[in-house]
Regions:
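Loop-rich catalytic cores of soluble enzymes, especially ATP-dependent carboxylate-amine ligases
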Residues: 1-3, 7, 11-123, 130, ...
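Short, glycine-/Ser/Thr-/acidic-enriched flexible segments
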Residues: 17-19, 136, 143-145
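Short helix/loop capping segments that flank catalytic or ligand/cofactor-binding pockets
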Residues: 21-24, 139, 147-149
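A conserved active-site cap/scaffold subdomain adjacent to cofactor or substrate pockets
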Residues: 105, 143-175, 179-182
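Beta-strand-rich recognition/accessory modules
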Residues: 120-122, 137-140
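Generic recognition of flexible, low-complexity loop/linker segments
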Residues: 123-128, 145, 149
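Peri-catalytic and regulatory segments of divalent metal-dependent proteins
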Residues: 133
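Conserved small/polar residues in nucleotide/adenosyl-binding loops
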Residues: 189-191
C-alpha cells in the first residue's frame, strides 16, 4: 500500500519596502529587465542549493509522502510555465527576447459557453517549486510542518545570489550590457 498524506504550499515572493513585487512579470516579461534578473538569480539559488531547500522540508513523515502516490516528487525542480520558459530560451538562443507568449483562446467545444483566455503562465501541479503568476509556490512542506525553515533557506540562498549579482553589476563599466549578459548567462546555466 502506498503512503498518502498532505502538504502545504508556501507562496513565496519578494516585495520592496515600497510594495513593488519583484516577481511581477508585467504584460511584457521579455522587456522587464528587473524581473528577469530577479527570476534568473532565484533559478541559480535553487539550482545551486537544492540540497538545502530539500532539507528544509525533510522529516520522517514528509519523506514518506514525497514522491509516493502524490505530487510533488522528492527531487527539487523548477517550473516556469510556457511563457517564461520561452522568454529565457529566446535569450539563450538569440541573445535577445523579442516577445512573450500570451494566453490562447480555449475553445470549450460547447456552443452555449463563451470562449475564454487560457492563462499563459500554466499551473504545473507536480513541480515542488513552481512559478505561478507573480510568486513561486514551494510545495514540499508537510502539512504539520512550519514553513519557517524553508523561508529561511529561500531567503538566504536568494540573498547570496543577489549579493553576487550586485557585486558584478556594480563593478561593470556598462551596466545595461552587464545586466543583459548576466541574465543570459544565468538562463543558460540554470534552466
Amino acid at each position: 500500500a502506498g503512503v498518502n498524506g498532505s502538504g502545504k504550499h508556501n507562496n513565496w515572493s519578494l516585495t520592496t519596502d515600497d510594495g513593488i513585487n519583484l516577481l511581477e512579470p508585467g504584460k511584457t516579461p521579455h522587456e522587464n529587465i528587473q524581473f528577469l534578473l530577479v527570476l534568473t538569480c532565484i533559478l541559480k539559488a535553487v539550482d545551486e542549493h537544492a540540497d538545502l531547500l530539500r532539507e528544509s522540508a525533510a522529516d520522517v513523515g514528509n519523506d514518506e509522502r514525497l514522491g509516493g502516490n502524490e505530487a510533488p516528487p522528492a527531487v527539487i525542480s523548477v517550473f516556469l510555465g510556457e511563457q517564461l520558459q520561452d522568454v529565457l530560451e529566446q535569450l539563450i538562443s538569440t541573445g535577445t527576447a523579442t516577445h512573450s507568449k500570451t494566453g490562447e483562446i480555449l475553445d470549450t467545444g460547447v456552443k452555449t459557453l463563451p470562449d475564454f483566455m487560457k492563462d499563459a503562465t500554466d499551473r504545473n501541479r507536480t513541480s515542488p517549486f513552481a512559478f505561478t503568476g507573480n510568486k513561486f509556490e514551494f510545495r514540499m512542506v508537510g502539512s504539520r510542518d512550519s514553513i519557517s525553515e524553508c523561508n529561511v533557506v529561500l531567503n538566504t540562498i536568494a540573498a547570496e545570489v543577489f549579493r553576487d549579482a550586485c557585486d558584478r553589476l556594480e563593478a561593470a563599466d556598462d551596466f545595461d550590457t552587464a545586466v543583459h549578459d548576466l541574465i543570459k548567462e544565468l538562463s543558460l546555466i540554470h534552466i
